[in-house]
């Protein structure tokens, strides 16, 4: 049986207890701010009621008030982190002891971001650097017109300007400045090795200036230093160098692969090479395949690569296209056979896919341009069947044109598997007889010089085959 007892406490003791309860907790507990990061800020026109701070093995969700204000403390290791508000993101450098206040207007996110407090200089530098990168980036069309030497010159100029910007920022954090300098070098080498410059370099066709420059930079890198290859930029260079070099059968690269790197790093390179067995790499796919065969022999993992390689080769121009027969939003079946006699431009997409939705305005523009031509525009949704209502609603809300149909089993649908579709949006062009014209056709929109525009390549391909 539970009972309540009356307890007598003398008046002096009661007063003492009352005083103890009213003393601030901070007297008994002092937080060591040198071991944490204090982060606060004000977001104008917030996109969400939360922001995310992400890094290697770290994630923190911070609440944003209705006024756009936030405040929190973080226990982090020194390094680069991502600041993300569900729509926009930026890089932020954090280390224990930093006390940063951030102001942003999401309507001009990159242009307005500003840091005040301990740690402001490295982060204001990053904000200005990313604006510099955006301003000096070149689009695909401009890149295609450049020779390897012109692209090399452009990259070197940007690299040197980046170093100047870093020096002018008067960074008071030597560790950050050193790592940023290292980052610029790896960024530059990744860009060069992964471009037409790298192809000419590994094939022995580059100019003496390019050859000497890359030889000097690459030979100065200690590939046995595993600690060197920890950042995303150094890893990107590492994979680019070995992928391009091994595919080109470069002796120096092969020697480094066999003698200077560990088994885990080799697995990463193999993974990078596997990505080359793809529609996105038609020109060099055979070379990637032969490289993997040489490195892996006939083990089980290579047999899977071989199967995929043979399947992709079966989807070359002129071969019969895999077929589809799926219902439209009213339930009426639409098949490839029913569209014979027309060019068929297929868009495989989903309502949850941001890059897919970014193509919609340009797809509609393309449809309007070819409205009087014998071209069928077919959009195949690979949403889950349970989301069919959402799909139908988007058709109405976005005023989607063309033929809108829904695959029967999302990613596992036969058409999707037959075309080895591993990422969307994916566009396919089929001729009037049901044969493949392009298993990975140009998208309606191309990104050039910071903007999307109707893609000349798909218009040219359609015109050539009408």
Model-inferred region functions:
Residues 1-36, 461-466:
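Bacterial Sec-dependent N-terminal signal peptides
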Residues 32-179, 187-204:
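A non-transmembrane, solvent-exposed segment enriched in polar/low-complexity residues
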Residues 176, 248-320:
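N-terminal targeting signals for export/organelle localization
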Residues 179-197, 226-240, 262-276:
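Amphipathic alpha-helical repeat scaffolds of TPR domains
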Residues 303-336, 401-403, 456-464:
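N-terminal "domain-start" segment that seeds a small globular fold
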Residues 327, 392-426, 432:
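Short, internal strand/loop/helix patches
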Residues 340-341, 347-365, 379:
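Conserved redox-active cysteine motifs that mediate thiol-disulfide chemistry
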Residues 429-466:
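Thiol-/selenol-based redox modules, centered on thioredoxin-like
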């Amino acid at each position: 049986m539970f009972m309540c007892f009356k307890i007598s406490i003398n008046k002096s003791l009661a007063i003492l207890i009352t005083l103890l309860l009213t003393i601030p907790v901070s007297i008994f507990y002092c937080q060591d701010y040198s071991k944490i990061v204090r982060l606060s800020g004000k977001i104008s026109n917030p996109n969400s009621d939360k922001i995310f701070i992400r890094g290697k093995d770290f994630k923190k969700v911070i609440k944003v008030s209705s006024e756009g204000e936030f405040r929190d403390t973080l226990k982090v290791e020194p390094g680069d982190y991502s600041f993300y508000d569900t729509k926009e993101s930026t890089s932020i450098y954090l280390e224990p002891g930093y006390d940063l206040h951030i102001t942003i207007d999401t309507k001009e996110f990159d242009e307005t971001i500003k840091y005040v407090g301990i740690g402001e200089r490295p982060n204001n530098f990053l904000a200005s650097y990313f604006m510099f990168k955006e301003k000096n980036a070149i689009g695909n069309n401009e890149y295609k017109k450049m020779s390897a030497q012109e692209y090399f010159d452009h990259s070197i100029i940007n690299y040197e300007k980046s170093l100047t910007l870093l020096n002018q920022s008067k960074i008071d954090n030597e560790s950050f400045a050193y790592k940023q300098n290292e980052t610029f070098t790896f960024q530059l080498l990744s860009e060069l090795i992964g471009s037409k410059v790298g192809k000419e370099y590994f094939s022995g066709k580059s100019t003496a200036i390019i050859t000497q420059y890359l030889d000097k930079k690459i030979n100065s890198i200690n590939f046995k230093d595993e600690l060197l290859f920890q950042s995303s930029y150094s890893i990107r260079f590492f994979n680019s160098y070995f992928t391009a070099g091994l595919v080109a059968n470069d002796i120096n690269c092969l020697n480094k692969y066999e003698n200077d790197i560990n088994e885990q790093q080799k697995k990463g390179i193999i993974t990078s090479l596997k990505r080359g067995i793809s529609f996105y790499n038609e020109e060099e796919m055979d070379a990637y395949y032969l490289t993997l065969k040489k490195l892996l022999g006939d083990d089980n993992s290579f047999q899977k690569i071989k199967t995929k390689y043979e399947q992709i080769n079966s989807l070359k121009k002129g071969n019969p296209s895999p077929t589809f027969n799926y219902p439209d939003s009213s339930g009426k079946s639409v098949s490839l056979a029913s569209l014979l006699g027309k060019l068929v431009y297929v868009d495989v997409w989903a309502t949850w896919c941001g890059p897919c939705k970014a193509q919609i305005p340009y797809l509609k523009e393309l449809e309007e341009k070819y409205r009087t031509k014998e071209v069928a525009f077919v959009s195949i949704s690979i949403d889950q069947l349970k989301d069919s209502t959402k799909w139908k609603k988007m058709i109405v809300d976005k005023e989607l044109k063309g033929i809108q149909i829904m695959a029967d089993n999302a990613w596992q649908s036969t058409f999707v598997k037959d075309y080895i579709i591993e990422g969307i949006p994916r566009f396919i062009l089929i001729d009037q007889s049901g044969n493949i014209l392009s298993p990975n056709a140009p998208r309606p929109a191309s990104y050039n010089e910071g903007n999307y525009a109707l893609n000349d390549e798909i218009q040219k391909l359609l015109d050539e085959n009408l």
